[in-house]
Amino acid sequence: MRASGQGPQRRRRGWATRDDSAVTFRDPQPRQPAGGARALRGPDPRGPARAHQAGPLLAGARRSQHMVGGAPPRPAETGCSRSRMTQKNSKLCARANVYTQVPDGGWGWAVAVSFFFVEVFTYGIIKSFGVFFNDLMDSFDESNSKISWIISICVFVLTFTAPLSTVLSNRFGHRLVVMAGGLLISLGMITASFSQRVYHMYISIGVISGLGYCFSFLPTVTILSQYFDKRRSVVTAVASTGECFAVFAFAPAITALKEHIGWRYSLLFVGLLQLNIMVCGALLRPIIIQGPGQSPKAVTLEPRREVQYMLENEKTRTSIDSIDSGVELTTSPKNVPSEAKMEQETRAEQQQTLVTAPKHSQMKAPLLDFSVLKEKSFICYALFGLFATLGFFAPSLYIIPLGISLGIDPDRAAFLLSTMAIAEVFGRIGAGFVLNREPIRKIYIELICVILLTASLFAFTFATEFWGLMLCSVFFGSMVGTIGGTHIPMLAEDDVVGIEKMSSAAGVYVFIQSISGLAGPPLAGLLVDQSKIYSRAFYSCAAGMCLAAVCLALVRPCKKGLCQNSHSGENQTDRQRGKALQDIPEDFLEMDLGKCEHRAHMKMDPV
């Protein structure tokens, strides 16, 4: 905007203030009693009107500098300017990224790296916890099933508190929630290293660290899915390999570390490493994406016109010309800014309006949308996750005890877990590239992998020596990698709920998994305690995967409407029409009832 009609126009960022007739923007710098450091910059290119705003002291200093021929100092040379630049840069780093469409890159690559290390210090540690099982049984003199409850409670809290994680992320942002989760994880693991009873670990690792795992993992994978569209499958699959590399590295490393410093100090060391999750959470910048059919100009002008209409409600005259044709607004031209002026303000403050407009809509959005439970396709997919969780954690926990029970050396048994992790890496990456192809229906690929995973779980019960377990571990790792890296991002696909409901659907989906997460490892441990055979633990995993395959096969038919009655579409259309009528503001429109009645009489007259 120009000052006194002089000088070239300069685009500036600022806060918007609105009065009855115009929209002005003020400088976002701190208030100063007399013009501030801007008065030291010399002649203002926007004219003398700006110079008169400076105080007499600073204005006199500026005149004296021009009299002696000295150039005014740069803003960077003053301490006040440096502090303002630091504050500006910090606000820029904390500001949300605004895109007109899904970027498929940009800052999303930093988010992908953060998700990789979050996977390392969350699920990587959970899957590597099996190396402590024999030490905990000897130290606490407890049975296998009671030790299994540590991970069971942890997984239960991780999944049960998923809706809470979604609500907190929508309320306070993903970054703050993930950083708080990293602190809780480290606190619980460090506290567990001083435990004297097994139930102490139920609270420290099970409850405290389990809550931290939920706060760290779910918001990270949710915001990563928002940064990518076409590359979502491959990026998520590659980033999720962090847990695989963690298992490959941590299993032999922790085993060797225990021999030198004991299991307690090893657990303390792991807890300190998990503080890095707070660094990963600091990189999660929020993202705002406009509607797919809106141009920047349309998104910018619409909120401004809406505010203008609200401020000038008494000066606006509207009427309903016809019941069938909808609502027609008739507004006085003097109350609407000119098109040239509107475009001029649009170009100058496009970024500020794009940032503030979505926030206005987000304030009205629910913190947790339970409407996903009305979709039968989501219910079937949630049941798939419920039964599949039985087979996710137990094999990694019992593969080392199974190898030791068959007479395999403990070091070679730990190598089985590392081999499983490496195979999982290739499974995740391969699934990412396969699912990234457009013609492929992704949910069918996942169904095939679930069936093959069920077969691999049954194969563990027939292995009797090292190479048989090695073959089963490779096959199981590759299949669980394809499922583990895609089952949550699959919610963003149109076959389930779509990207719009991804955040709420992920919270509800993981919450439903909590039941099997609590019952899975203890059920496997109970079978081991009764039979004294570790291979029996894989029967419950295989049975759960069979039921998961059946539920997953029903997702696509439910989405296509084959499982719905014929009247569901009509009822949904009626509800949408009723909602559209309720959204019309009553105090905004002044209905011309006389005009409507006149047209109604005209229609009733015979021709």
UniProtKB/Swiss-Prot annotation:
Residues 1-84 are annotated as: Disordered. It is a multi-pass membrane protein. Residues 127-146, 197-202, 255-268, 405-414, 464-465, 529-536 are extracellular. It catalyses: taurine(out) = taurine(in). Gene3D superfamilies: MFS general substrate transporter like domains. One of its GO terms (molecular function) is taurine transmembrane transporter activity. The chain crosses the membrane at residues 106-126, 147-167, 176-196, 203-223, 234-254, 269-289, 384-404, 415-435, 443-463, 466-486, 508-528, 537-557. GO terms for cellular component: basolateral plasma membrane. Its main location: membrane. It is found in: Basolateral cell membrane. The modification Phosphoserine is found at residues 319, 322, 325, 332. PROSITE patterns: MFS (PS50850). Belongs to the major facilitator superfamily. Monocarboxylate porter (TC 2.A.1.13) family. Monocarboxylate transporter selective for taurine. May associate with BSG/CD147 or EMB/GP70 ancillary proteins to mediate facilitative efflux or influx of taurine across the plasma membrane. The transport is pH- and sodium-independent. Rather low-affinity, is likely effective for taurine transport in tissues where taurine is present at high concentrations. This is Monocarboxylate transporter 7. It comes from Mus musculus (Mouse). The lineage of its organism: Eukaryota, Metazoa, Chordata, Craniata, Vertebrata.
